[in-house]
Amino acid sequence: RHWVATEYAPYFYRAQIESVDAPIRIATGAAAELRVRVTNTSRQTIAFQSERQRGVHLGAHLRPPGGADPTELRAGFVDLELEPGAATELTLPLPPLAEPGRYEIEIDLVDEGVKWFQALGSQPLTLPIEVAEAP
């Protein structure tokens, strides 16, 4: 069990995602971006693609205050072969948020049309986002 939980990575479905610019505080209605560093911790190359419907991309679920349904976001539309052990920085655009409060964003990689990496044991990055009334 320990090997499966800590070392086994099916195919290329294991990555470490770290925030480059946290904590996040934004004003209502303001556009924002979140930069993350993605490190390939699998033993195979992760193939990012510029096409939206295929390949690997950065994906996120943005959960608003109050438990409403999350908004699904995508980024990382680049042609990039991320070798095992290599890292890259990607920027995730955040939509303007109208409601003040504490949001939560869960960031993962997604193999479009196949699986989110989390489904196969990779740990997503979860961060709070504080949204305050614009001055």
Segments from the language model and where they lie:
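Low-complexity, acidic Ser/Thr/Pro/Gly-rich terminal tails and inter-domain linkers that flank the onset
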Residues: 2-28
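Short proline/glycine- and polar residue-rich coil/turn motifs
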Residues: 78-88
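Short, surface-exposed ligand- or partner-binding patches at beta-edge/loop junctions that are enriched
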Residues: 101-111
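Short, surface-exposed loop/turn segments at beta-strand-coil junctions that are enriched for proline
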Residues: 94-101
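Beta-sandwich strand segments
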Residues: 46-48, 113-124
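Short, hydrophobic/aromatic beta-strand segments
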Residues: 44-57, 104
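Asparagine-centered strand-capping/turn motif at beta-strand->loop junctions
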Residues: 38-42
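Short beta-strand and strand-turn-strand segments in soluble, beta-rich domains
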Residues: 54-79
